[in-house]
Amino acid sequence: MEAPSPDEDLEGTPEEGFIFVLEKASLETAKVGKGYQILNCDDHPNFLRRHGKDPADYRPDIVHQELLAILDSPLNKAGLVKAVFVHTSKNVLFRISPHTRIPRTFKRFCGLMVQL
């Protein structure tokens, strides 16, 4: 069996396009109060400092903005984005389809990411 060439899409058919990888994404969840939340430097600075973590490392808003930018881009509208992979700082990798609709508000985005 022959290995797929780099220009083949994820389903195995030759196709041009782009694959984006968001590396070291800070999408860490923690139990804050009654439920789980995505940690971020604006809402949880005291929690992060209490646990010996640098609040500057917790910026899920950057991931949110990048996903919106990629999925709203002319490249995606032209059908040239094949996939977006998000690799978190906790070594979790997941794929986001180019047809996915990312919530416009950061709060709803965090709510969705907690459910994953």
What are these regions (language model features)?
Residues E2-L116:
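RNA substrate-binding interface of SAM-dependent RNA methyltransferases
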